[in-house]
Amino acid sequence: MIGLLLGLIYYIPALVANGSAPFIKSGTPIDFKRKLNDGRRVLGDGKTFEGLLLSLTFGTTVGAIISRFLGIEWIIIGFVESLGAMLGDMLGAFIKRRIGLERGARAPILDQLDFILGATVVLISFNVNLNIYQVVFVCVLVIALHMFTNYVAYRLKIKSVPW
């Protein structure tokens, strides 16, 4: 059980980074509104430089706080993990655009786990000792948290859709 909770702690910067981006309502799109040959936007209006900066700031800050408690250097990992999470989220948006889904359209599993994939790649590349049970635990927890937090964000008018 302690191992599962430690696995969750490892993912906190990514969770915070992913959860903070929706607070930015508008900004400069990362894709600069460019379209690919299929006529669709690369990422869409939902991925902005301002949202990315806020996500990196919050995720890095949480990494710094974690480093105080774990006694290890998590500031850098917090930053890079947050970046990995946001790149995973952008990959999810890219895939959604390629299959014809617009911003806000449902894409079960992809919507919930794209950022976890990016964070996991970073954590593994930094030799963080994750096991399959920790990753599965975090994925299941993230799916449940995603449904709950998105509904709350929708009710608070932070998001335009409840998913």
UniProtKB/Swiss-Prot annotation:
Gene this chain is encoded by: carS
GO cellular component terms attached to this protein's record: plasma membrane
Compartment(s) of residence: Cell membrane
Predominant cellular place of this UniProt entry's protein: membrane
First-level EC class: transferase
Protein keywords: Cell membrane, Lipid biosynthesis, Lipid metabolism, Magnesium, Membrane, Phospholipid biosynthesis, Phospholipid metabolism, Transferase, Transmembrane, Transmembrane helix
Name of the protein described by the UniProt record: CDP-archaeol synthase
EC number: 2.7.7.67
Gene Ontology molecular function terms on file: CDP-2,3-bis-(O-geranylgeranyl)-sn-glycerol synthase activity
Any one of the GO BP annotations: glycerophospholipid biosynthetic process
Disulfide bonds: none
Family note: Belongs to the CDP-archaeol synthase family.
Source organism (scientific name): Sulfolobus acidocaldarius (strain ATCC 33909 / DSM 639 / JCM 8929 / NBRC 15157 / NCIMB 11770)
Pathway in which this enzyme or protein is active: Membrane lipid metabolism; glycerophospholipid metabolism
Regions crossing the membrane: 4-24, 52-72, 75-95, 107-127, 128-148
